[in-house]
Amino acid sequence: MNQPVLVLNANYEPLNICDTRRAIGLILTGKAEMVANGRGYIRTARISYPRPSVIRLEHIVHRPRPRVKLTKREIFRRDNYTCQYCGHQAAHLTIDHIIPRHRGGQHRWDNLVTACAACNRRKGGHLMGEANMHLRRQAVEPAATASYLFGRHASDNEEWRKYIEGW
C-alpha cells in the first residue's frame, strides 16, 4: 500500500506522487480514474481492486509551476554527484559556496556547487581566482521538468515514462 502512484491532472500533466492507499481513496470517491494498472490487485474480504500505478484527476487543478527545492541532495543530483572543481566522483562530497558567505555570497542555486573534501579545503574561504580553481560547469537552478521531478521513480515504474516525458 506504500508503493508510489503517479497523479496526473485532468489534462494528463504530471502533478504529484502519492501512495496506493491515497490513490484508491481518490478513485473510490470519484475524484480520479485509474489510467494504468501494472501491479496486480488488492484483495479485501468481498472485492478485488486493481492496484493503480497512474491515476488521473477528474477536474483540472490549477497550481503554480513547481520549483526544485534547494537542498543538499538536489545540489548533488544536479551536479551528478561529481566534484565541480576536479571532476572526481568521491564517496564523501560537500557543498561549496562559489563566493564564500563571509564575502557576501548567497545561499542560492547559482552560488552552490558539489565539491570533494580536498577541493573544498583547498578553496577554503577564497574566491575561485584567488585559489586558482575553475568550475567544470556553471551552477544554475535545474529546470523543474516532470522528468527531473519524478525521474527517480521512473526506473522502477516503466509505465510512467509516457506521461512524464514532454512535460
Model-identified regions with their sequence ranges:
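Histidine-centered nuclease catalytic patch
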Residues: 66-68, 87-115, 123-139
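Short helix-coil boundary/hinge micro-motifs
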Residues: 1-67, 133-167
